[in-house]
Each structure stands twice: as C-alpha cells, then as structure tokens.
Amino acid sequence: MSETTQGPTHFRLMSKLKAIGPYLREPQSQEGRYYFDCLSVCVDDKKSPEKREFWGWWMDLESIEGGFTAKYHIGKYNKEGKWVSEALPQKVVEEVYFTQSTFHQKLIDTLAEHFKLEVEYHTESFDFA
C-alpha cells in the first residue's frame, strides 16, 4: 500500500475477522496484531468441561506493509487455559491440520476481498505442509 493509501481501521478489521468464525480472541488482540486460536480436538471428553484439554493451534496475525504475516503454533490448550507448544499425537494431526487449513483460506479470502490485503506465513510459523 502506498503512503497515500489508508488501510482499514482496526474496528473494520475486527468486524471482518470476527465474521470468519469463533477463532478471534478479542481481549488478546490490539491494533496491528490479532490473536486467533482453535481447540480442534478434545484430549479426553469424559472429563468435566472445566478440566478438559484440547489439541489445536494458535496464531498471531501481524500487520506488515500490504498485508499481514501469520505465525502459527501447534500444541495443547491445558486445563489452566494456556497454550503449550507440544507435538500432536498422530491420531489428531489430520483434524488439526484441516481446521487450520480451512481457517487460513477463509482468512486469505476475507482480507483479499474486503481490503485487498495479502497474508503470508511468518518465517517462524509452524509448517502445516
């Protein structure tokens, strides 16, 4: 974007990012930096809801010239409500990768359609390939 072109406001971006799905975490987001996560697979659904842990991913979306970089991580969302970087068990890899891929395509499409902005993977992002 040129210096004379104004990008979308934080509030317009938040509105469109929220519409993608339940992934945006508003309290952890701020102008120019947006936080997303996805609890893809429950570790043990026999436990009571407040003690459940999940396999999934989280991502920091950071504003750069002309768009955003997406830095993804994978791991476990523990019962304390914190993400822990951890290798996924083989039985959940397909589902976690699917939720990330589906979300990422929606993110790309939304930012391109509404704001003509691009999304690229951060150099330190987890590689879902």
From Swiss-Prot:
Gene Ontology annotations for the cellular component aspect, listed alphabetically: cytoplasm
Domain of life: Bacteria
Subcellular location: Cytoplasm
GO biological process: positive regulation of DNA-templated transcription
Coiled coil: none
Start and end residues of each stretch annotated as Essential for activity: 99-123
Primary subcellular site in the record, as a coarse category: cytoplasm
Xref: InterPro entries: Tscrpt_reg_Crl, Tscrpt_reg_Crl_sf
Pfam families, per database record: Crl (PF07417)
Record-linked NCBIfam families: PRK10984.1
HAMAP family listed in its UniProt record: Crl (MF_01178)
Family (UniProt): Belongs to the Crl family.
Function field: Binds to the sigma-S subunit of RNA polymerase, activating expression of sigma-S-regulated genes. Stimulates RNA polymerase holoenzyme formation and may bind to several other sigma factors, such as sigma-70 and sigma-32.
Protein name (Swiss-Prot/TrEMBL): Sigma factor-binding protein Crl
